[in-house]
A protein has these predicted regions:
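Metal-dependent nuclease catalytic cores that hydrolyze phosphodiester bonds in DNA/RNA
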Residues: 1-97, 102-111, 118, 150, ...
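A structural signal for well-ordered alpha-helical scaffolds and beta->alpha junctions
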Residues: 61, 65, 120, 124, ...
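Metal-dependent nuclease catalytic cores in nucleic-acid-processing enzymes
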Residues: 66-72, 115-144
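Residue-level detector of short, conserved catalytic/binding motifs and their immediate flanks
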Residues: 89, 125, 253
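Metal-dependent nuclease catalytic regions and adjoining charged, substrate-binding loops involved
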Residues: 114, 133-221, 225-230, 234-266
Length: 266
């Protein structure tokens, strides 16, 4: 038997996928657009091909969702419209909106769900506001849940989510206001009044060590600041003079519209 990776066919297939992905572009403004209206603005004004990484994530997530819903005996929610905003809840468990999310990282620790699942919960809040439901289900599949030092395993988590009436009313107002802002921005070709996306969608700020910490006294270089601090805290290194590490700050762009949008990062 002989097996070889065929780079030329691979490249052709990837280009075909990218060229044909999204040809059936969805019309109108969707609820998910109002979670990140500035990104939606740039997608309309300056459409770019989806990366193969984006396509791979989207297709794997949607395939899991479809299979799981079918196995549970539930149908995919139909596309509806409310005040000119289109939306599609993943499904309804009984009459309760339910959203299925797949993660390539661990589940949230207990007590940190609101922080870790913030973006998921904002989407659910929008659905609940429109459907006038104070209850929701958030179903999360972690593909890489830590089990021990040698392996990870997929793990499901089902969360009861509840909102109060004030939260629903505030979200209905926000959806309408954001829709109007987005429509005005597209009409005037100016996104300045649109809120920025969450920073984790824009870029990562990396602190890169360019010069390692160095002990002048004993002419020794250390890989980390921790190592240098450990040295001067020891009997052999007590009183030694340390030249601290030097760093540069690098921005690693995540969003393809980063240069157009120019987000402000801390």
């Amino acid at each position: 038997m002989k097996i070889e990776r065929n780079k030329s066919v691979e490249q052709w297939a990837i280009e075909e996928i990218q060229n044909n992905w999204g040809n059936e572009a969805r019309e109108g403004i969707h609820l998910t657009d109002l979670l990140t209206p500035r990104r939606k603005y740039w997608q309309v004004v300056k459409p770019l091909k989806a990366s193969i990484k984006e396509i791979s994530y989207w297709t794997s997530g949607s395939a899991i969702e479809a299979k799981i819903l079918a196995a549970m005996g539930y149908a995919k929610g139909e596309t509806k419209e409310w005040k000119g905003i289109k939306y599609s809840v993943d499904t309804f468990l009984g009459n309760i909106p339910a959203e299925i999310k797949t993660r390539r990282r661990a589940l949230a620790e207990e007590g940190k769900e609101e922080e870790i699942y913030e973006h998921y919960l904002k989407q659910l809040l929008g659905y609940c506001a429109i459907e006038n439901s104070t209850k929701a289900w958030l179903i999360v599949l972690s593909m890489l849940e830590y089990k021990d030092a040698t392996h990870t395993e997929p793990e499901w988590a089902f969360y009861d989510v509840s909102f109060d009436e004030n939260e629903l009313e505030d979200e209905r107002k926000r959806l309408i206001e954001t829709k109007l802002l987005l429509e005005d921005a597209l009409k005037n070709k100016n996104p300045d009044l649109l809120p920025y996306c969450p920073k984790w969608m824009c870029a990562r700020t990396l602190k890169i060590m360019t010069k390692k910490p160095y002990c002048i006294t004993c002419n020794k270089e250390f890989e980390t600041e921790w190592g240098a601090n450990k040295h001067i805290s020891s009997k052999t290194g007590a009183g030694h003079e340390i030249m601290p590490a030097e760093y540069e700050i690098k921005v690693e762009k995540i969003c393809k519209y980063y240069d157009d949008c120019k987000p402000v990062l801390d």
